[in-house]
């Protein structure tokens, strides 16, 4: 998605350790116009798959997931990283490792909001090592839900995440695919 690539080039910052900081439009401050276009792009790609719900992880996946949900006219469910007094029982839970935070988190979805009647689209902000998406796939499997596709905002194609997700046989679509974050700047792969 050329618009997203422009945002990444203009407002993204490469940090040591192959970390891409995009808090100017995605991870801290959110650009609603960009989110709307991303939601439309995900909807166009997955509209014919019978999606009944979108599933993501808090917090940076929520905005793109909500805009995709608007475009597809389906609800959005986000896996919580922290338990709260209102989210204690009847949960599907998986453990995921965060590449940027260098820690593992249990993520949970209430059984009330995900069932074997659902066909879901998983949406996440980044694909690096694939752990977040795999955790959501595990939750879907526990619920008996069908996963029709995986939508990624920014994929670091030089890391193993895409390879791991491809092994699941579930279609993966990334709006921006980064080939490298080297000294010469951010290099993108061609659009899918």
From Swiss-Prot:
The gene is xpt. Keywords: Cytoplasm, Glycosyltransferase, Purine salvage, Transferase. Its main location: cytoplasm. It is an enzyme of class 2 (transferase). Its EC number is 2.4.2.22. Pathway: Purine metabolism; XMP biosynthesis via salvage pathway; XMP from xanthine: step 1/1. Homodimer. Converts the preformed base xanthine, a product of nucleic acid breakdown, to xanthosine 5'-monophosphate (XMP), so it can be reused for RNA or DNA synthesis. SUPFAM superfamilies: PRTase-like. It comes from Listeria welshimeri serovar 6b (strain ATCC 35897 / DSM 20650 / CCUG 15529 / CIP 8149 / NCTC 11857 / SLCC 5334 / V8). It is found in: Cytoplasm. The keyword Transferase applies. CDD domains: PRTases_typeI (cd06223). This is Xanthine phosphoribosyltransferase. The keyword Ribosomal protein does not apply. HAMAP family: XPRTase. It holds the Pfam family Pribosyltran. 5-phospho-alpha-D-ribose 1-diphosphate binds at residues 128-132. One of its GO terms (biological process) is xanthine metabolic process. It catalyses: XMP + diphosphate = xanthine + 5-phospho-alpha-D-ribose 1-diphosphate.
């Amino acid at each position: 998605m050329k618009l997203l690539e422009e945002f990444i080039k203009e407002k993204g910052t490469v940090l040591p350790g192959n970390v891409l900081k995009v808090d100017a439009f995605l991870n801290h401050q959110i650009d609603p116009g960009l989110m709307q276009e991303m939601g439309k792009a995900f909807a166009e790609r997955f509209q014919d798959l019978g999606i009944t719900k979108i599933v993501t992880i808090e917090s940076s996946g929520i905005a793109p997931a909500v805009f995709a949900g608007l475009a597809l006219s389906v609800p959005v469910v986000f896996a919580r990283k922290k338990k709260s007094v209102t989210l204690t029982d009847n949960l599907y839970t998986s453990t995921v490792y965060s590449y940027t935070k260098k820690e593992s988190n249990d993520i949970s979805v209430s059984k009330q909001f995900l069932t074997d009647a659902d066909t879901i689209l998983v949406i996440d902000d980044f694909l690096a090592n694939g752990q977040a998406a795999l955790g959501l796939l595990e939750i879907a499997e526990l619920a008996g839900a069908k996963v029709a596709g995986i939508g990624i905002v920014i994929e670091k194609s030089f890391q193993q995440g895409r390879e791991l997700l491809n092994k699941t046989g579930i279609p993966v679509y990334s709006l921006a695919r980064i080939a490298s974050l080297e000294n010469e700047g951010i290099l993108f792969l061609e659009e899918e």
